[in-house]
Structure formats: C-alpha cells, structure tokens
Amino acid sequence: FQNAWVYRGSVVQCNRYFAPGACTGLTEPINNFEAIPPKDKDGNKTGEKVFVLCDRHCKGYYHWTHEQLPRLGIMYDRLIKDPTITITAPAKGMIMQYLTILGFPKSQVRDLYKKATSDRYPTAFYKTVYYPQPMRCGSILAPQLFLIRKIMFERLSLEAVRTKPVDKENMLVVMADRRDSRQPRNSRNITAMLKARFPNVEFVSHLGKDVKTQITLFNRADLVIGPHGANLGNIMWCKHGATVLEFVPIKTGNLCYYQTASKLDLQYRMLMVPLAIDVAHEVP
C-alpha cells in the first residue's frame, strides 16, 4: 500500500480499511483511530517503509506463533536485506526473542501496541506499507507453516525429520505446563507417576525457559503432554512423527493443535477432561 496509516494490526487509507484476519477477524477496533498528519512535527510518527506483523492478539503464544509469525516468512529475505523496513510488533518478551533469533535487531522493531492515551493506541503514517496475507483463526495455513519452519530450522540448525527410530527406553517427554487454571490440579501427581513407571525416560518442563530453549526442546521431543494452551504452539517445531497428548476440555475444546499436528504428520492424541477451558480441574 502507498501512503497509509497503521493502527495496531490494521492498515487504514482514506477509502478503505484492512484487518489482519486471524482470531481478530474483522473486529479490530478502530473507533478510536485518529488520522495524524503525514508529516508530524515530532518526527516520530511517520516513516518510509513498514511491515505490519502483529494484531491485538499476538501477545498470546498460540496466536503469535500460528497467526502472526508465519506471515513474516513471505517477506523474510527482503526484511533481512533491507533493515530500513520497520517491523511493527511488541518489542519485548517472547516476541522480541523470536525476532532476535530470526536475525532482526530491536532497532528495526517498532512497538505500536502500547496505549498512547487511556483509550487510544499510537497511529503511524508510512509512505509504503507491506501487509502480508492474513491468517485464519485456529488453523495455520500449511505453506506458511512449512516456510517459517524452514527459516527457523536453518537459523537454529535443527532437523525436521527423524534420522533414527524412537528408543522407547530413552525417550524425551516434554511436559507443557501452565501456571493458571488450565493446568490440572493433579499435574504433579501425574508427572511423579510417569517418572516412577518409566525411570529411564527424561521428563522436562518448558516453564521458565527462553524461546530458543523451548523451540529446541520441542524439536527434540518424542512425546509432548499438556493442557490446552501451555505453549503447545511449540509443536510446530516438532519433528515429523512425534506424539502429542493434549488435555482437552469437554465443554470448550477446539482443534487448534490438532490442525497443526495433522499438517506435520504428528501423532495426535486427545484426553478429554471435565468442565470448561479456564475452570480448575483434574485429569482422571
């Protein structure tokens, strides 16, 4: 687009408006959008070229890894070669860790996701706006999935395919844990029971580990076990043939992770648990 405003994940021109898709759909609120003059006296709201990456849901791990990050793959080579193209994304936390792994300095990232006032986010005007293909909610598109895997695996020297059969006596099991009500109340008992029954198996939790370590762990994993959420979006980095066991709430379950698993030839298993998605529960 030429000569457009960027407001969070949306692109606005005088006669049209583009929403980012994903789970935001067409509901990205622009009721508080304020079109600033193209030339701002402070010089900090205008720019030449920008790549609009994130929408308002990108701070969620699944939404970031499956609905925002894959959009970067289409423009990756150009963004690396031309650091004058600004990338819009929160410039901190796990998002900045991902962008750093992919080779983007913090100076190339612009955070338009902090409120400028109590009811309005910053607006920025750019002469050229790159806006990649929107993603669907809850179901990553296969071409973008394989493209971002290829890029990430090349950056971290990881493999996409197993080179030897699984040794059932010496497996790596990643326990995808959470710190909220989605985590089963008896999760510690489950882990203790599994460790006692399979003493030679390595059980590792991803909690507290940085993004690079998480990606590497899931890539090495033979089996991933965890509740809905719990950074299960990391199964997109698993090798083909790994097994995923997800604790799925009966009342509010969805097939987000099944969609990813099916595209990557992962062995997906579902264990139904009682109640709804954010209600404290135990795994039977």
Residue positions per predicted region:
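The feature primarily captures lumenal catalytic ectodomains
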Residues: 1-284
